[in-house]
């Protein structure tokens, strides 16, 4: 592959890969820490971390060594067998989440797969309530994003994502995000589960009012519905805590993205014996989920986050960049949850800002016409973040000029 450049590789990409992502912005060939390089030798500061995946940056030496060692020892065993790393990771996640006795973990390969498992878990909560009516409804939130596989897509709010693939699994309805009264009005004994992202990343990094998650816990408990937190984007330290659930224990929680430090893995944690036994033997499964290499990578990632104090660092660095962004006159709003940050622009030119940021050597993304998201590796320095803020006025000016007729 030596000597090949971006345009040639992108031409080959367009001839050989499905166009579901459009044409990639660059061909990346190498990464180290928070920096990546493209096929033409240009260097970029990665402030997106593969969409909140590379929690420890690129080619982290400890994760790399653990994965290499595990792959050289035992790579895959199927679901007929288990491995020490799979068991150890399940135990670690149960401990970190404060899981009560009887809680259990199911491993998958992605966030969408974890949410598919949670959807099936919810369907199993079908026993009629006191009034004798079957539990056929599932409630999700407006602006929610839970994935693009069929069950996860059925939970996702945006009609443009869903409509080309209808009919989807039925019985899903949406209520206004952050509105406890709307949730209370919607949830009764016919509801099997309520799905909530503690912070809606794809909606522009939007959290909920204080007390909302606790109210959701009370509402679902009273109705006999499961409360499922989708922490695919927010979990594993992204927001400066292991989880973004504000101390509220749901009935189930999904994880992925940063869990493997760049290696594909997802997880569903079911809390308590009653919930963890809803899915019986043979009712769900996966070939690759929880394989020795992925679980070893996740254990190494969790160890590094804890041993290097990255939860506190995420809180501190996130607050610093949020304050700096808020001081810019063209930034009209900032929402920072640790190192998951969304900021709004005075003009709806976020896609152009993203393009010019890339030209300037920064990887960020737009979650809407006027909102830019940052989700850098948890090892990013305040200096690197503030360097982006320093460059942002020129980037914004270039984007404004592009959008001006």
Q: Where do the model's predicted regions map?
A:
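Conserved N-terminal phosphate-binding loop of PLP-dependent enzymes in the Aspartate aminotransferase
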Residues: 1-405
């Amino acid at each position: 592959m030596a000597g090949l450049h971006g345009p040639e590789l992108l031409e080959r990409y367009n001839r050989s890969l499905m166009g579901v992502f459009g044409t990639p912005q660059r061909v990346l060939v190498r990464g180290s820490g928070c920096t990546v390089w493209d096929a033409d030798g240009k260097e970029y500061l990665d402030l997106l971390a593969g969409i909140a995946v590379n929690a420890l940056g690129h080619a982290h030496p400890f994760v790399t060594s653990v994965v290499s060692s595990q792959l050289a020892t035992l790579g895959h065993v199927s679901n007929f067998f288990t491995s020490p790393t799979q068991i150890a990771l399940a135990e670690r996640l149960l401990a970190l989440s404060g899981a009560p006795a009887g809680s259990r973990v199911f491993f998958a390969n992605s966030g969408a797969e974890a949410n598919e498992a949670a959807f099936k878990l919810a369907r199993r909560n079908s026993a009629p309530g006191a009034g004798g009516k079957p539990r056929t409804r599932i409630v999700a939130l407006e602006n929610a994003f839970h994935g693009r596989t069929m069950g996860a897509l059925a939970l996702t709010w945006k009609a443009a994502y869903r409509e080309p693939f209808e009919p989807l699994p039925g019985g899903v309805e949406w209520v206004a995000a952050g509105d406890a009264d709307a949730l209370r009005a919607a949830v009764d004994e016919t509801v099997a589960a309520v799905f909530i992202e503690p912070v809606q990343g794809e909606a522009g990094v939007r959290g909920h009012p204080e007390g909302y998650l606790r109210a959701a816990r009370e509402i679902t408990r009273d109705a006999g519905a499961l409360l499922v937190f989708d922490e695919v984007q927010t979990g594993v330290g992204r927001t400066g805590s292991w989880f973004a659930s504000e101390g509220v224990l749901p009935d189930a929680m999904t994880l992925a993205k940063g869990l493997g430090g760049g290696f594909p893995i997802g997880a569903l944690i079911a809390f308590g014996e009653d919930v963890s036994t809803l899915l019986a033997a043979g009712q769900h499964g996966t070939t690759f989920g929880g394989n020795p290499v992925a679980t070893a990578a996740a254990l190494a990632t969790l160890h590094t986050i804890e041993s290097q104090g990255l939860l506190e660092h995420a809180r501190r660095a996130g607050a610093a960049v949020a304050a700096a962004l808020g001081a810019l006159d063209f930034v009209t709003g900032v929402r920072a949850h640790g190192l998951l940050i969304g900021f709004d622009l005075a003009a709806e030119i976020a896609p152009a800002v993203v393009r010019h940021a890339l030209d300037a050597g920064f990887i960020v993304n737009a979650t809407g016409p006027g909102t830019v998201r940052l989700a850098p590796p948890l090892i990013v320095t305040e200096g690197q973040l503030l360097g982006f803020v320093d460059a942002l006025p020129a980037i914004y000016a270039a984007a404004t000029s592009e959008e001006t007729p």
